[in-house]
From Swiss-Prot:
Location(s) in or outside the cell: Cytoplasm
Organism: Leptothrix cholodnii (strain ATCC 51168 / LMG 8142 / SP-6) (Leptothrix discophora (strain SP-6))
Keywords from the UniProt entry: Cytoplasm, Lipid biosynthesis, Lipid metabolism, NAD, NADP, Nucleotide-binding, Oxidoreductase, Phospholipid biosynthesis, Phospholipid metabolism
GO molecular function: glycerol-3-phosphate dehydrogenase [NAD(P)+] activity; NAD binding
Pathway linked to the protein: Membrane lipid metabolism; glycerophospholipid metabolism
The protein's name: Glycerol-3-phosphate dehydrogenase [NAD(P)+]
Active site: 196
Family annotation (PROSITE patterns): NAD_G3PDH
Pfam families, per the entry: NAD_Gly3P_dh_C, NAD_Gly3P_dh_N
GO cellular component: cytosol
Lineage of the organism: Bacteria, Pseudomonadati, Pseudomonadota, Betaproteobacteria, Burkholderiales
BP GO terms, sorted: carbohydrate metabolic process; glycerol-3-phosphate biosynthetic process; glycerol-3-phosphate catabolic process; glycerophospholipid metabolic process; phospholipid biosynthetic process
Residues annotated to bind NADPH: 11, 30, 113, 145, 260, 284, 286
């Protein structure tokens, strides 16, 4: 099985390292110099400096070579194990471009989480627009890139309407340290991956303010309710949000100190400006970029998301963290739902 991973950030590098343990794998990045350095040092010094990469992982900045690697056997083997797989590991902002450039015959997964800025679309909706014939899906779940690259135990979910894509994801990545479950609810899996980033910022704010473990538990639980309401309005199944891509990813991102979104919340509570925080992080924090889009999409659907609304107000500078917490606590009493 031939695998190409498009995007040499931390997560793309980690997934490529896992895939290379079992299959011929190529990691592609936009910067040929960076890819040459990764190939020579077997480390991604910019995004994942603390993980050694397998010697058999091929690194390239050549787009044509990346597609040729995975196209060589796709569709030519009677044995399904010979089919190739493309894994898109770019930020959400580049997913549309990537999907439009991938040949329609190649099974494809994306790793990015969030709603597309401007359109408010999820990944599967973008795919429907730009590559309607592409067999594709999403790989998501509670996972920090460094732990995956170091082969620490992790469980993910591959969601697609195409059984061939789900099967390819399991064949490509399921192994001793990585379990991959299959799902046919990409909507639910994507909503979970998008909303948990915003909720992690909220939890980071609460923890940074020293509000205690009770407050953390309340935010995670009520945040899960927000996530589920939005997902149901978009056509997802409720049970998906109790799985890896919903509750699992939310708990990890909201409580794990490797989470960039959580760190944004912690620093906002400490009085730093958003500009200062993003400059210091140096990497993408999807929750910052997707929070407003999540709230806008929810508004169009008539879905109430008070925690998300509070995060957006803080990120936009219209509300201090302490005032946001006070506003949430002063909401009218209601039945739990």
């Amino acid at each position: 099985m031939q695998i190409t991973v498009l995007g040499a950030g931390a997560w793309g590098t980690a997934v490529a390292a896992q895939a290379a343990l079992r299959h011929p794998t190529l990691l592609w990045g936009r910067d040929p110099a960076q890819m040459a350095e990764i190939a020579a040092t077997r480390r991604n010094q910019r995004y994942l400096p603390d993980a050694d990469l397998p010697a058999r992982l091929v690194c390239s900045g050549d787009w044509d070579a990346a597609l040729a690697h995975v196209s060589a056997r796709a569709g030519t083997d009677a044995d399904a194990n010979g089919a190739g797989l493309v894994i898109v590991a770019t930020p959400m902002a580049a997913l549309r471009e990537m999907l439009a450039r991938i040949p329609q015959g190649l099974p494809t997964l994306w790793l990015c989480k969030g709603f597309e800025a401007g359109t408010g679309l999820l990944g599967h909706e973008i795919a429907r627009e730009v590559a309607p014939q592409l067999a594709c899906g999403v790989l998501s779940g509670p996972s920090f890139a460094l732990e995956v690259a170091r082969q620490q135990p992790t469980a993910l979910v591959a969601a697609s309407q195409h059984e061939s894509v789900r099967d390819a994801a399991v064949r490509a990545l399921h192994g001793a340290s990585l379990r991959v479950y299959a799902s046919d609810d990409p909507v639910g899996v994507e909503v979970g991956g998008a909303v948990k980033n915003v909720l992690a910022i909220a939890t980071g704010i609460a923890d940074g303010m020293g509000l205690g473990l009770n407050a953390r538990a309340a935010l995670i639980t009520r945040g899960l309710a927000e996530m589920t309401r939005l997902g149901l309005a978009l056509g997802a199944r409720a049970e998906t949000f109790m799985g890896l891509s919903g509750l699992g990813d939310l708990v990890l991102t909201a409580t794990g100190d490797l989470s960039r979104n959580r760190r944004v919340g912690l620093r906002l509570a400490d009085g730093q400006t958003l500009a200062q925080i993003l400059a210091e992080l140096g990497h993408v924090s999807e929750g910052v970029y997707s929070a407003g889009t999540v709230l806008e999409r929810a508004g169009r659907l008539g879905v109430d998301m008070p925690i998300t609304a509070a995060v957006v107000a803080v990120l936009q500078g219209g509300l201090a963290p302490r005032d946001a917490v006070a506003a949430l606590m002063q909401r009218e009493a209601r039945a739990e739902s």
